[in-house]
Amino acid sequence: MKPSYPQHIAVIMDGNGRWAKKQGKKRTQGHKEGAKIVRDITQWCAEKGIPYLTLYAFSTENWKRPKIEVDFLMKLLEKYLHDEKPVYMKNHIRFRVIGDISVFNTRLKNAILELEHATQNHTKLTQILALNYGSRDEIARTFIKLAHTLTPHTLASLSSQDIISMINANLDTATLPDVDMLIRTGGEKRISNFMLWQASYAELFFTPTLFPSFGKNELNAMLEEFLQRQRRFGGVE
């Protein structure tokens, strides 16, 4: 069977702060530049016909950062959602969020929900932002939901595949395909509590390029390498 581009790309956007430091600028400037690349990479994936793109924007661990930086990131996110809405509408891009947004302030939550609603029928590409997201937290929340619906008697009658299907149906990503390709910029070689369940069979790509410097040519090279890899999913050729 002829190899094809991934259906679902996930990106750990790492290196904004280090990029800013190298430029002699504040970390906040690095985040601003990173937001521009979010727009670009979404457009590049749409041009390639890739249906789903998930971007790790703010993790459950990022609250440990200095309050001034966290506050800036929240304001930057709200501004991004407002400023980019015409782009989503014009390019028929659907916007979705995974993660626990209940802790965000009302204005930010409303901006997220408004853009999700406005773009819910768009079909060109679905862009998913992972916000206040951690894979362990997601799985724990899923188990809590299931615990309210399953009795010991019901559980005893289920096969492991039944349980896997139930978990899939209750994750934040319930209606999304598994991740085929996971990219991390910034040089680190770990996946940092990101989509541990969904990326079980993903092809991993690590680059030393800091996220604000990540470009179309590098993405294209990764996509070409993806086409060359043999994905056997535990089987044989």
Curated annotation (Swiss-Prot):
Keyword Zinc in record: no
UniProt-listed Pfam families: Prenyltransf
Active site annotation, chain numbering: D14, N62
GO biological process, one term: polyprenol biosynthetic process
Binding-site residues, Mg(2+): D14, E203
Molecular-function GO terms, alphabetical: ditrans,polycis-undecaprenyl-diphosphate synthase [(2E,6E)-farnesyl-diphosphate specific] activity; magnesium ion binding
PANTHER family given in the database record: DEHYDRODOLICHYL DIPHOSPHATE SYNTHASE 2, DEHYDRODOLICHYL DIPHOSPHATE SYNTHASE FAMILY MEMBER
Function: Catalyzes the condensation of isopentenyl diphosphate (IPP) with allylic pyrophosphates generating different type of terpenoids.
Quaternary structure annotation from Swiss-Prot or TrEMBL: Homodimer.
UniProt cross-references to HAMAP family, sorted A to Z: ISPT
Name this protein carries in UniProt: Isoprenyl transferase
Organism listed in the record: Helicobacter hepaticus (strain ATCC 51449 / 3B1)
